[in-house]
Design a protein with these regions (language model features):
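N-terminal small/polar-rich segments of proteins
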Residues: 21-87, 120-137, 141-143, 147-153
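Bacterial N-terminal signal peptides that target proteins for export
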Residues: 1-8
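Hydrophobic transmembrane signal anchors and adjacent membrane-proximal interface regions, especially
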Residues: 7, 29, 41, 57-58, ...
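Mid-chain, structured segments of secreted extracytoplasmic proteins
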Residues: 68-115
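N-terminal signal peptide c-region/cleavage motif recognized by signal peptidases
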Residues: 17-19
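Generic, low-specificity signal for short hydrophobic/alpha-helical stretches with a mild N-terminal bias
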Residues: 4, 60, 109-115, 128
Length: 153
């Protein structure tokens, strides 16, 4: 019984000291935009053994502009997030000009794009993004709801 009380006390302390990821702050990236503004997915050739073989692919440039004015001088991590939706999974792979980190994520995931002290009121970069989907892509138009989250240290 005494052991059980210690376990309950330890769990209670763990809940009080929850990591910062438990409450990420969504950042305003409403000034970000894609070039071109609308992208059409293209069919990939059928090649057995390759992921997304026979699926769809598109390339887009994203001019990223994140409002960080409330966090200037604070240390933390910024993640790019792609929520899962009801349609087929999307894989996004990107390179950057250097302010943000290159990376990869799939629907329902988030990926680290910045670590350190927030340098100014905006965080800007340009991403070259490859989007891929399986052949079950079923829509002529679909809005992808990428966004950015900040976790403060």
């Amino acid at each position: 019984m005494k052991r059980c009380k210690h376990l309950i006390a330890a769990l209670g302390c763990a809940l009080l000291v929850m990591p910062s990821w438990a409450n990420p702050h969504r950042l305003d990236d409403s000034l970000s935009h894609t070039v071109p503004p609308n992208v059409e997915m293209q069919w990939l050739p059928l090649k057995s053994g390759q992921s997304f073989a026979g699926g769809m692919e598109a390339w887009v440039r994203v001019n990223v502009r994140i409002d960080t004015r409330n966090w200037v001088g604070r240390s933390g991590r910024i993640y790019m997030v792609l929520p899962r939706d009801q349609a087929s999974n999307i894989e996004a792979v990107w390179t950057t000009q250097g302010r943000l980190q290159a990376g990869r994520l799939v629907s329902g995931e988030r990926a680290l794009v910045f670590v350190g002290t927030v340098p100014g009121t905006t965080l800007e970069d340009q991403m070259q993004v490859r989007l891929r989907s399986n052949a079950d892509w079923s829509s002529n138009s679909r809005r992808l709801d990428f966004h950015f989250e900040l976790e403060i240290d």
